[in-house]
């Protein structure tokens, strides 16, 4: 393996090829549109059918995870972290980045950060959103999420936020740790489909005019604030439709 390669290990997504999910799509597009050939990506994949394989030039490796309920994601991240460290040792990699998506393993991270630092490898974290506020979790799990987030921010070398508000929150709530943060927005493939026949039929059926509507796309879960958006739309003076 060339010593000039920049080794970047990504854990925390379910893996690629992406089936669904924001982190999965991020990793899919990051590797698909890679321009810098000096970077070698490694991607952890949960319960993949193959132990090791390549996709978009990334070296993907399977992490087998038992069904242990809500703790499944925590188990997965820790197992992936162990696998990455073993790979680093076995291949004598002495410089690189471990990029962890989401803040699930805060109580366990400090130990691994020290191990990776001994190999001159930095640990980056994407904190995602306010997981500890999600209504689907009970009180105990929400408390764990908040603790885990705090310890992830405390021990990470760098925090990559995909929301300006999340970056502001990290800087304010964890000011005492002086976190090094940056904001990198997600990209998107923008395609003009307004003239497609299916859209024309749908728009006519629902009496929706081109460029005269607001579009919301997302899952119907409490934290996506559909109720707030619909309520505010109804109280506004806009003449446009809401789709």
Named regions from a protein language model:
Residues 68, 104-107, 124-141, 157-158:
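A short, histidine- and acid-enriched strand-loop-helix "catalytic/donor-clamping" loop
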Residues 9-11, 203-224, 230-237, 243:
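Conserved donor-binding/catalytic core segment of Leloir-type glycosyltransferases
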Residues 153-181, 188-190, 199:
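A short, active-site helix/loop in glycosyltransferases that binds the activated sugar's phosphate group
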Residues 141-159:
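Membrane-proximal helix-turn-helix segments that form the acceptor-binding/catalytic region
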Residues 74-83, 95-128:
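An aromatic- and histidine-rich active-site surface loop
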Residues 5-6, 11-19, 33-71, 165-167, ...:
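N-terminal strand-loop element at the rim of the active site
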Residues 58-82, 134-141:
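A short, charged, and often flexible helix/loop element on the N-terminal side
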């Amino acid at each position: 393996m060339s010593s000039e390669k920049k080794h970047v290990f990504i854990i925390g997504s379910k893996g690629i090829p992406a089936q669904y999910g924001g982190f999965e799509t991020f990793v899919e597009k990051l590797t698909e549109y890679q321009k810098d050939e000096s970077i070698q990506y490694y991607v952890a994949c949960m319960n993949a059918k193959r132990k090791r394989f390549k996709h978009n030039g990334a070296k993907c490796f399977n992490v087998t995870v038992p069904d242990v309920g809500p703790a499944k994601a925590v188990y997965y991240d820790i197992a992936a972290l162990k696998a990455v460290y073993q790979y680093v040792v076995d291949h004598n990699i002495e410089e690189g980045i471990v990029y962890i998506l989401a803040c699930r393993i805060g109580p366990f991270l400090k130990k691994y950060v020290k191990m990776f630092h001994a190999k001159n490898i930095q640990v980056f974290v994407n904190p995602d959103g306010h997981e500890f506020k999600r209504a689907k979790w009970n009180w105990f799990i929400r408390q764990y999420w908040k603790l885990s987030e705090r310890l992830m921010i405390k021990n990470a070398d760098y925090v990559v936020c995909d929301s300006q508000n999340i970056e502001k929150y990290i800087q304010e709530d964890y000011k005492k740790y002086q976190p090094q943060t940056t904001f990198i927005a997600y990209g998107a493939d923008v395609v003009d489909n307004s003239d497609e026949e299916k859209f024309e039929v749908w728009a006519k059926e629902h009496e929706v005019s081109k460029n005269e509507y607001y579009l919301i796309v997302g899952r119907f879960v409490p934290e996506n604030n559909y109720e707030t958006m619909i309520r505010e739309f109804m109280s506004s003076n806009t003449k446009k439709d809401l789709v």
